[in-house]
A protein has these predicted regions:
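Glycine-rich loop-to-alpha-helix module at the N-terminal edge of alpha/beta enzyme cores
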Residues: 47-137, 147
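Conserved C-terminal structural/oligomerization subdomain of aldehyde/semialdehyde dehydrogenase
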Residues: 48-51, 236, 273, 327, ...
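Rossmann-like NAD(P) dinucleotide-binding subdomain of oxidoreductase/dehydrogenase enzymes
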Residues: 139-282, 407
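Short gly/ser/thr-rich secondary-structure transition/capping motifs
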Residues: 24, 30, 139-147, 220-221, ...
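Hydrophobic face of amphipathic alpha-helices that form TPR/SEL1-like repeat modules
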Residues: 1-45
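ALDH superfamily catalytic-core signature
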Residues: 238, 246-387, 411, 450, ...
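Residue-level signal for inorganic ion chemistry
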Residues: 47, 83, 105, 127, ...
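Short, well-ordered beta-strand elements within core beta-sheets of diverse protein domains
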Residues: 50-56, 71-77, 162, 272-275, ...
Length: 502
């Protein structure tokens, strides 16, 4: 039996319960069918139905928000060591079920096994990291003045809403939920409707680890129903959202009446800039990895290659050769590098850019084709002879599609890099240190890597500028969102108090 066949057999064992019972909401430690009916979730591999999923509505969100509100005082006041122990047990539970999580995620999203097996473990790492931060989360400062001893402390903001996307959904859910729980908040989680499976597994793991009922509630469904109700609910004090920029704008409007605090990790049209003095072998590997891994369906993908004109032809020639060798196939095959796109709607969007590129005058140097008709597979694609005014250089395609644009000077490279509505990440390849310092200072991006692909370090800030988001995740920055700063001043003596009415 091949590795693919073994993975399919294991997957079928894990899917049996979903096919039998569907996926229900999980509110206050109990299953709820809800009042919004059901929808079907499909696998992008072969367009088959995986199972039925409860479709959340405003009533379901109200139940979940009230459960989170009721559970908040006890969770907030639980000793930090106890909360830490529970988060560590959640991490251990994720590790124990990592294979199940990865298999389900591959089938649910089309992501390749080679990446999802690592993403599941990364989810456990997120919980372990924030478990270690629990005891210091409330730490503040001592600020002495002439008449007062001033101290600051942090307290959890309250029940929060977490809305997560369909790309690497399990890992990104842990990335948002772990710090919220570590801070002492309770959570209502609304996962993407296109990838509901592993959100159910996560809440099961959390409850088995001892998380009290109501601390983490999961309501499945669509943004226009469950998502909108969550962002508008008065008991929810903050919304953490990962997804499209236009949706982030809608959430801002929906949460305005309740003065909702928001954190957005949104879209990107990220540049990778390669100068003539770079280590071109390593740069080539990084360029390919950062757009074609994870199906190109990630916010930090470097979808614009800015290449110095003196090395353009040689670099693009090698790039075309490598792109044409990328293995597209079944996501559960360990040899597969790119699987199918997430859904019919997204497939139609990504493939529409094949004609858009041609009509705008770009050349399809690699790919630009659909593969088969049993799933949402496309060939990894490279556009050349492009300029930054083209739609393929300005719009987030969110697939395995790279646009190559030449530049003649450092100033021109900087102008092109910044000429986009987005500002999430940028990648710079040069061996000139002074150029790197100069260039990174002027790049309009929240995160920049020099001579490296995206290598995340959990304590560092993660987030973008412009249309790519608001706020930062990671390390103490996560607590700045999920907690409120509180100032207390203690008089150190009988200082003068102004007297009125005497």
């Amino acid at each position: 039996m091949s590795a693919l066949e073994q993975n399919i057999e294991k997957l079928n064992g894990h899917l049996a319960r979903f096919q039998r019972s569907g996926i229900l909401h999980r509110i206050a430690g109990a299953d709820h069918a809800g009042g919004g009916g059901v929808f079907e979730t499909l696998s992008p591999v072969d367009k088959s139905t995986i199972c039925q999923v409860a479709r959340g509505d405003a009533g379901d969100i109200d139940k979940a928000a009230k459960a989170a509100k009721a559970a908040f005082p006890a969770w907030r006041d639980m000793p930090a060591k106890q909360r830490k122990a529970i988060l560590i047990k959640i991490a251990e539970g994720i590790e124990a079920r990592a294979e199940e999580i990865a298999l389900c995620e591959c089938w649910d999203t089309g992501q390749a096994w080679r990446f999802m097996s690592k993403a599941a473990i990364r989810g456990a790492e997120n919980f372990r990291y924030f478990a270690d931060q629990v005891e210091a989360a409330r730490d503040g400062q001592h600020l002495q003045s002439a008449t007062l001893m001033n101290i600051t402390t942090r307290v959890p903001i309250g029940p929060v809403g977490v809305i997560t996307p369909w790309n690497t959904p399990f890992m990104l859910s842990t990335w948002k939920i772990a710090p919220a729980l570590a801070a002492g908040c309770t959570v209502v989680h609304k996962p993407a409707e296109a990838s509901p499976l592993t959100a159910r597994i996560l809440v099961e793991i959390a409850e088995e680890a001892g998380l009290p009922p109501g601390v983490l509630n999961t309501v499945q469904g669509y943004g226009e129903d469950a998502g909108k109700a969550l962002t508008e609910h008065a008991d929810i004090k903050a919304i953490a959202f990962v997804g499209e920029s236009r949706t982030g704008s809608m959430i801002t409007k929906q949460g305005a009446d309740t003065l909702k605090r928001t954190h957005f990790e949104l879209g990107g049209k990220n540049p990778v800039i390669v100068f003539e003095d770079a280590d071109l072998e390593r740069a080539l590997d990084a360029v390919i990895f950062m757009i074609y891994s994870i199906n190109g369906e990630r916010c930090t993908s470097s979808s614009r290659l800015l290449i110095h004109e003196t090395i353009k032809d040689a670099f693009e020639s090698r790039l075309i050769e490598r792109v044409n060798k990328i293995k597209v196939g079944h996501p559960l095959d360990p040899a597969t590098e790119i699987g199918p796109l997430i859904s019919e709607e997204h497939f139609a969007k990504v493939t529409s850019y094949f004609d858009i590129a041609k009509n705008d005058g770009a050349q399809v140097a690699a790919g630009g084709e659909v593969l088969g008709d049993t799933g949402y597979f496309i060939r990894p694609t490279l556009f050349t002879q492009a300029n930054n005014a083209m739609r393929i250089a300005q719009e987030e395609i969110f697939g395995p599609v790279l646009t190559s644009i030449p530049f003649a000077s450092e100033d021109q490279a900087l102008q092109i890099a910044n000429d986009t509505p987005y500002g999430l990440t940028a990648y710079l390849w040069t061996n000139d240190l002074t150029r790197a310092l100069r260039f990174t200072d002027k790049l309009e991006a929240g995160m920049i890597w020099v001579n490296s692909e995206n290598v995340r370090h959990l304590p560092t800030p993660f987030g973008g500028v412009k249309a790519s988001g608001i706020g930062r995740d990671g390390g103490d920055w996560s607590f700045e969102f999920y907690m409120e700063q509180k100032h207390i001043g203690f008089a150190t003596g009988a200082h003068k108090i102004s007297r009125l009415g005497v």
